[in-house]
A protein has these predicted regions:
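Conserved, mostly hydrophobic/aromatic
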Residues: 30, 84, 130, 244
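Acidic (Asp/Glu)-rich catalytic clusters
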Residues: 45-48, 70-82, 121
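Glycine/small-residue-rich loop that forms an oxyanion/phosphate-binding "nest" at active or ligand-binding sites
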Residues: 90-123
Length: 274
């Protein structure tokens, strides 16, 4: 993974990490992935504390009804909304990289994003960003052609949409060379390896499910652009947006702690804006 590029169209330059003397960062989560979480109020509770929602749009989860419900939740909470496309693989929740032709993948991504855009248009809502899900997210980090396929799908729908990718990944430069704006993402609730990759979820300590630990990591990222790796080494990561995973146990409590600690540290939590 190429680390910490100087990115021409990066939001760290367009928006800035500072507005005046105020540090700013976005707080995002993946929403609308489970009808059960929508029904029991879990997504609604999490939505209270984030500023951007990545909405499942049919590839790994979600349908027209859940998209509409999630968009309405976002409207009620003044949360910016984005598309969360994946490999077309509902059976595996988009967690496995599929070996399919690039043209088919690009068309699938475009179809997923377009479906959410159509639902949003009916509700008079604008889709601000696109963040790939699961295996597609990591494939974009590793494979330039897959990143280009995603970028071209976004360009064909709305070239003003922001594409979210992992901070330090070469995919951000690929999106920028296509003419897209990008947002570099870091993770409040995931452990980092010394090379800057996320710790495998199958290993102990991969997920920071303590609100205090996640909030401390978020503050370090938001104020200093630094995070401690599992080895104890300090990594430098410049991020425009922080992610809290909705499937992390106690995700709403984590998001609340992150937002409160960021505010206490003088960081304004503000949504991505196209």
């Amino acid at each position: 993974m190429r680390r910490f590029p100087d990115e021409e169209h990066h939001l760290a330059e367009d928006r800035g990490k500072k507005i005046g003397m105020v540090l700013t960062i976005d707080l995002n989560a993946d929403i609308g992935e489970s009808p059960e979480r929508l029904a029991d109020g879990s997504d609604a509770e999490l939505m209270r504390y984030i500023t951007s929602a990545n909405i499942a749009c049919g590839g790994h989860a979600g349908n027209a009804l859940t998209m509409e419900q999630t968009l309405e939740l976002a409207r009620q909470n003044n949360v910016a909304v984005g598309a969360h496309p994946s490999y077309p693989d509902r059976n595996n929740f988009g967690r496995i990289a599929l070996n399919i032709p690039l043209a088919d993948l690009q068309n699938s991504i475009a179809d997923q994003v377009s479906e959410l855009v159509a639902v949003a248009r009916r509700l008079k809502t604008t889709i601000i960003h696109v963040k790939p899900h699961g295996a597609l997210y990591h494939s974009c980090n590793r494979d330039a052609e897959i990143a280009r396929a995603l970028g071209r799908a976004v360009l064909a729908i709305n070239p003003r949409m922001i594409v979210v990718g992992q901070a330090g990944s070469a995919c951000l430069s690929i999106y920028q060379h296509l003419g897209l704006r990008t947002a570099a993402e870091a993770f409040a609730d995931r452990a980092y390896e010394p090379d800057g990759s996320l710790r495998n979820r199958n290993l102990a300590g991969a997920v920071l499910d303590s609100p205090e630990c996640a909030a401390a990591q978020a503050v370090s990222l938001g104020t200093q652009g630094r995070v401690l790796a599992t080895s104890g080494a300090e990594l430098t990561i410049s991020a425009d947006t922080l992610c809290v995973h909705s499937d992390t146990p106690g995700s709403a409590a984590i998001a609340r702690a992150v937002r409160e600690r960021l505010a206490a540290a003088g960081v304004a939590v503000r949504a991505l804006r196209a």
